[in-house]
């Protein structure tokens, strides 16, 4: 971009859900609690205030995905960080306080309970069946072709057998990839097309 112009910006969240000062617990008689420690960033994916992701070119979506991967990998270099969540808010109904199109990345020092349970169940499945549960589900869905919405060389998009919410779609890599930070540029280019 030309001087002063930008297409994607990343900055610390002005009102972070977590902080990075490694605060200790705060005790209150019977209860013990801990402050949410971590990193909270905003990824603004367009300079245009009225644009939304469906207005973006595939190339621009790929650049957004690569920016998120870059921030993910940078956050995971911190030995205190155990879990990174990436999400996109769209409008006030989703809790967005910033109307401009953006994503949020929250990196925390503990694995959230729900994610820990998912990881434990995946590990149990792998011990019993010799493969990752996500890979097994993706293979099953690709074989049955009942819930497949879209498919590319490296990805499959499908509705879960038991959705937790309306319009839920899972997008999974066809081959086992440990985490988002391991996706290649080519894979993210392909994912952007979906």
Predicted features and spans:
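HIT superfamily nucleotide-processing domains
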Residues: 1-194
């Amino acid at each position: 971009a030309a001087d002063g112009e930008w297409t994607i910006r990343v900055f610390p969240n002005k009102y972070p859900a977590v902080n990075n000062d490694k605060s200790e617990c705060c005790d209150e008689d019977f209860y013990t609690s801990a402050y949410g420690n971590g990193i909270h960033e905003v990824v603004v994916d367009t300079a245009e205030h009225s644009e939304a992701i469906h207005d973006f070119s595939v190339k621009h979506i790929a650049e957004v995905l690569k920016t998120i991967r870059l921030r993910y990998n940078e956050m995971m270099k911190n030995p205190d960080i155990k879990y990174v969540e990436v999400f996109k808010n769209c409008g006030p109904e989703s809790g967005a306080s910033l109307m401009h199109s953006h994503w949020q990345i929250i990196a925390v020092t503990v694995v959230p309970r729900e994610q820990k349970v998912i990881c434990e169940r995946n590990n149990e499945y792998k011990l019993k069946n010799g493969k990752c549960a996500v890979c097994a589900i993706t293979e099953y869905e690709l074989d049955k072709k009942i819930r497949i919405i879209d498919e590319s060389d490296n990805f499959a998009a499908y509705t879960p057998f038991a959705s937790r919410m309306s319009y839920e779609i899972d997008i999974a890599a066809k081959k086992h990839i440990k985490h988002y930070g391991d996706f290649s540029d080519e894979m993210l280019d392909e994912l952007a097309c979906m």
